């Protein structure tokens, strides 16, 4: 089962103005992601997802080019089931032989940030292909189920000190969450403001 093609598409979904929010990363005006598509010579197609920036911010064009023209081209004609080996080679580039010979990773420069995001999208697509080829869900391939349910927390908490307590309590009361994560940091503009918001939340 050889890899025939690797492609990527930037998806941008505008967020209605009333549902936008501002974080440390800026105003969230759209949800951006890159859809990765890996096709094999057997006809199986796997899909993955990669992010161009933290908090869904960022232009997806560079990530699409990276996946399609650099990372993806390394994989054409290769065995789609050799997932760990492909990850190692994409991450370490021309230095992959060090990892194979010595048994440990040998990171090359420039293999973080955007590159690791691109690798992740391809990696997900390859796992998708493996699952399809075996007729198994990916969670089984990764070791199986550990529990029947998983606790979730609410993420948000952007309100100023005067309203943060009410906002966080709403997540618990209205959403049924047992825990919440509030945001503090550069969006506050001053660490004193962050401290006041945290104190008010308590």
Predicted regions and their residues:
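Structured beta-strand/loop patches that form or line metal/cofactor-binding pockets in enzymes
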Residues: 1-55
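Metal- or metallocofactor-binding catalytic centers and their adjacent structured scaffolds
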Residues: 5, 39-133
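A short alpha-helix capping/helix-coil boundary motif
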Residues: 14, 104-108, 146-149
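A short, structure-level motif marking secondary-structure boundaries and short turns
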Residues: 22, 111-113, 152-154
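Conserved active-site and cofactor/substrate-binding residues in soluble primary-metabolism enzymes
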Residues: 30-31, 62, 66, 81, ...
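Metal-dependent enolase-superfamily TIM-barrel catalytic cores that perform enediolate-based chemistry
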Residues: 143, 148-202
